[in-house]
Amino acid sequence: LIDKLYPLYLNLHVKARFRLAALTPRYFVEMKEQYPESFIVKTYSLNGEIVGFRSFFLNENQLDAHFIGVNYELNREINLYQRILYDFVSDAIHAGSSELLLGRTAAEIKSTIGAIPHDLTCYIRHRNSLSNQIIRPFIDYLKPSDWTPRSPFRLGE
């Protein structure tokens, strides 16, 4: 199974605007071994072939979306990424979660299902002042890109 999931994960990883490092091919197996009850992976199949997956942590009152993988050749045709988002919402509701965390990427499409952004403040300071000057452009690069908030709800009625 991992030989099917890992390439789908890499499809998203290579498209990411910011990435620190790629996961190892055994990452999902190791997460399941470490967190057998709370770490969940669900796959999407078309004509018997796995075309996507999503992983998440199901904690006491919270569903925390983790990594996903998508076959981009089929994504436009079958709206796979959007389906994954709806399924995260469905799983959170069925689990009785009071909170669904979808992560910090792809904010615009997540807002189409009702996700609300929350500011995240991060302070980084090195002991060495020269290092602080070197770090500053990197920190500026981490700022989220501009996006247009959407809403699935009718506003102003």
Question: Can you say where each PLM-predicted feature lies in the sequence?
Answer:
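Short, hydrophobic/aromatic alpha-helical segments in well-folded domains
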Residues: 8, 24-31, 84-89, 105-109
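Short, flexible segments with low predicted structural confidence
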Residues: 3, 64, 81-82, 138
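Conserved acetyl-CoA-binding loop-helix of GNAT-fold acetyltransferases
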Residues: 75-90, 102
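Active-site/acyl-donor-binding loops of N-acyltransferases
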Residues: 46, 95-157
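Generic signal for short, ordered secondary-structure residues
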Residues: 7-10, 71, 88-89, 139, ...
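A conserved beta-strand-loop-helix scaffold within acyl/acetyltransferase catalytic domains
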Residues: 1-76, 157
